Amino acid sequence: MEDPQVAAVERAMVAIRRSQTRRALQRLAGDVELDPALFGVIDAVEEETEAATVTSVAGRMGVDQPRASRLVARAVEAGLVRRVADPADGRRSTLELTELGVGHAERVHRFRREIFDAAMRDWSERERKEFARLLTAFVAELGRRHREG
């Protein structure tokens, strides 16, 4: 028998994914002058705790290596990311955000948080805290299961 709560979560997750399409983000972003396809690259480089590479960007974005490579190249061309020679292995390069990339990351964070804040505007502080706690735990568990295969 199907669990109605799990089905509701599935529908909500699909709706979130649809709302995060490139076209939807561009329409919402308005004055944020950044190709939404590069949002993921900025996020992936910024979130990496080790040295970011094209491989780590691909993993964080959930895309294959060739797609990540093309997106990283576009981010480099746009001046958002720079390639840096890895001192431990000269054949390898790592990625870091440029000053422009950091500025765009801050603007994107602000933009997203404004959208989320507006969506929760009528919620109590307790509801916001509980939602943040549950969503964070849910995402962590999904990530753990994804890594374990």
Residue map of PLM features:
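N-terminal leader segment of winged-helix/HTH proteins
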Residues: M1-P36
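C-terminal regulatory/oligomerization modules of transcriptional regulators
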Residues: M1-P4, K129, R133-G149
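Short, locally clustered residues in the helix-turn-helix/winged-helix DNA-binding domain
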Residues: R18, D43-T49, H109, T136
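N-terminal helix-turn-helix DNA-binding core of bacterial DNA-binding proteins
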Residues: R22-D64, A78
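A cross-family signal for key residues in well-ordered alpha-helices
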Residues: G40-D43, D117, A132-R133
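Charged, amphipathic alpha-helical coiled-coil/dimerization segments
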Residues: A73-K129
